[in-house]
Amino acid sequence: MKIKVGILGASGYAGNELVRILLNHPKVEISYLGSSSSVGQNYQDLYPNTPLNLCFENKNLDELELDLLFLATPHKFSAKLLNENLLKKMKIIDLSADFRLKNPKDYELWYKFTHPNQELLQNAVYGLCELYKEEIKKASLVANPGCYTTCSILSLYPLFKEKIIDFSSVIIDAKSGVSGAGRSAKVENLFCEVNENIKAYNLALHRHTPEIEEHLSYAAKEKITLQFTPHLVPMQRGILISAYANLKEDLQEQDIRDIYTKYYQNNKFIRLLPPQSLPQTRWVKSSNFADINFSVDQRTKRVIVLGAIDNLIKGAAGQAVQNMNLMFDFDEDEGLKFFANL
């Protein structure tokens, strides 16, 4: 028997990827597409490549008969929309940032709004499947992690958990394709602005910073402050992070490989690459995999960690489906058994 799901925000890039994945999921029926601006428009007219013969509607959510609702909506939308009564009727996976951070003051600092739903904020489960699997299985509201966040946390988590690095030395240099900025038209994302160009943005201000710090702090069991700098690169999709940290003791590469293996050997979507094989975005493109590898610089006594994901899949829609699978006791990789399209 299939579960019935709905999607708000299916017209965006992450929303379209969600539709594409769910159409190939054997245990899911997409029965509702919500929109306030595209009511009556058939989804195939918007995305001719996607064979979903369903029109956008604008119904009161309390009227819907769904098992699960995905929210691929802008920030600040779901914080006002969700309530306990709705969560009694259906499970929710929110792809926005509205329920990712536990401290309401972080929303005032980083997102410039006062969170209106602080009780639900405390009850939401952070949907990083490899870290919080058991909590996700029991959750009614899952906050799907950000794309940079997913790649950064997964790449560094074992080092923080084992406390083998100087936490104050951590620097994350991240690069993302343009789809990470969303589908809305912006001058800075026009072809002539991004083609043959690489640029940093939101220095010391990127909103994924507190998310990364919060969950690496949980791993380290102490407050973490790190440096995160994102860059926009001229490609459609993909994230590559290069992270640097000072080692606290003299460790060899095999020592660190043993640590990563300890934490990730049983995870279906994390690939610890062989020595000397460094992650590339094309190896994870259109897949739900996270590729990780590292090198120890004996000269500087630093570990250099590389991580790569597809920002729209493992960084958004694929991870949302992975969360859904856990919430409904499906196989974790159900509907996600696809590899990179080189």
From Swiss-Prot:
Catalytic activity line of the entry: N-acetyl-L-glutamate 5-semialdehyde + phosphate + NADP(+) = N-acetyl-L-glutamyl 5-phosphate + NADPH + H(+)
A Pfam family hit: Semialdhyde_dh
Sorted UniProt keywords: Amino-acid biosynthesis, Arginine biosynthesis, Cytoplasm, NADP, Oxidoreductase
Subcellular location: Cytoplasm
Pathway in which the depicted protein is active: Amino-acid biosynthesis; L-arginine biosynthesis; N(2)-acetyl-L-ornithine from L-glutamate: step 3/4
One GO CC term, this protein: cytoplasm
Active site: 147
Function: Catalyzes the NADPH-dependent reduction of N-acetyl-5-glutamyl phosphate to yield N-acetyl-L-glutamate 5-semialdehyde.
Annotated protein name in UniProt: N-acetyl-gamma-glutamyl-phosphate reductase
